[in-house]
Design a protein with these regions (language model features):
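Bacterial Sec-dependent N-terminal signal peptides
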Residues: 1-28, 220-225
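Short glycine/proline- and aromatic-enriched beta-strand/turn motifs that initiate or cap beta-hairpins
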Residues: 20-57, 161, 223-225
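Gram-negative (and chloroplast) outer-membrane scaffold detector with strong preference
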Residues: 23, 27, 61-142, 178-180, ...
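Residues that define the transmembrane beta-barrel architecture of outer-membrane proteins
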Residues: 25-27, 48-54, 95-99, 114, ...
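Flexible, solvent-exposed coil segments and beta strand-coil junctions
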Residues: 35-41, 80-87, 145-154, 195-200
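Extracellular loop and loop/strand-boundary signature of outer-membrane beta-barrel proteins
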Residues: 41-46, 86-92, 155-160, 202-208
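A charged, solvent-exposed segment within the mature domains of Sec-exported extracytoplasmic proteins
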Residues: 125-174
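Predominantly the C-terminal beta-signal and adjacent terminal strand-loop region
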Residues: 160, 165, 170, 176-225
Length: 225
């Protein structure tokens, strides 16, 4: 009986030590940069096309269990939209620059050299820049010769009222481990905004003015422990 108890205690101790060794917490810190492709979800609808921008930031990743971790990022991202005038030769682009903080669940799989992963979680942001580029008088578009009739125009000149943004982010990617503590990360991510940039009450023009974007980034991470 004593031998059995001793065996069980030894087995439990060995398992605990093994588990602690197997699930040693790891902290990674790094930077990333990439390209964004954005547009707005307006209601009523506005004819538009994807607007290209940039993103850059820093990431902190914490993994405590195999296949699972958490990521926090601090990014500068360009979003916005580009009006689509179809056959009419007008151009209008509006870059909205945000300071973004995604907080993501990180699920990964693979081997010691290359890993695939899925990231998913909420994201908050604050508008820090608003730049309009147009080749016509966008503040008074109805006075512009040959400007398309029956087109929504209020979004062209209205200031952003809600500078705080929030939404959901999801992405997939690959991590290539260069050395024991160094890795390169390629990720594609989609952001779906839940907050409107313009007032959206019944009396307002737009019932929705939410941002959406696709982000493609390349990053580097260093593992501290």
């Amino acid at each position: 009986m004593k031998k059995s108890i001793l065996f069980i205690i030894t087995l439990l101790f060995a398992t605990t030590v093994s588990a602690q060794r197997y699930y040693t917490p790891k902290i990674h810190v790094g930077g990333k940069a990439g390209t964004t492709f954005s547009q707005m979800s307006f209601s009523p609808d506005v004819k538009q096309s994807m607007l290209m921008g940039y993103m850059a930031g820093v990431s902190v990743k914490y993994t405590e269990e195999n296949y699972f971790g958490l990521i926090a990022e601090f990014n500068i991202e360009q979003r916005g939209w580009q009006e689509d005038f179809e056959e009419v030769p007008f151009s209008y682009k509006r870059h909205l620059t945000y300071f973004q903080i995604p907080l993501l669940t990180h699920i990964y799989f693979g081997n010691d050299n290359i890993k695939g992963f899925v990231n998913l979680g909420p994201e908050i942001g604050f508008l820090i820049g608003d730049k309009i580029t147009a080749d016509f008088d966008y503040k008074n578009p109805l006075s512009v010769p040959n400007f398309p009739a029956n087109r929504m125009t209020e979004q062209l000149y209205t200031d952003v009222k809600n500078k705080f943004d929030y939404g959901i982010s999801g992405g997939i990617g690959l991590e290539y481990i260069i050395k024991k503590r160094h890795s390169i990360i390629l990720e594609g991510r989609y952001y779906f905004g839940l907050g409107s940039i313009y007032p959206d009450k019944k009396k307002d023009t737009f019932s929705a003015s939410r941002g959406t974007s696709i982000l493609i980034s390349l990053g580097y991470m260093y593992r501290f422990k």
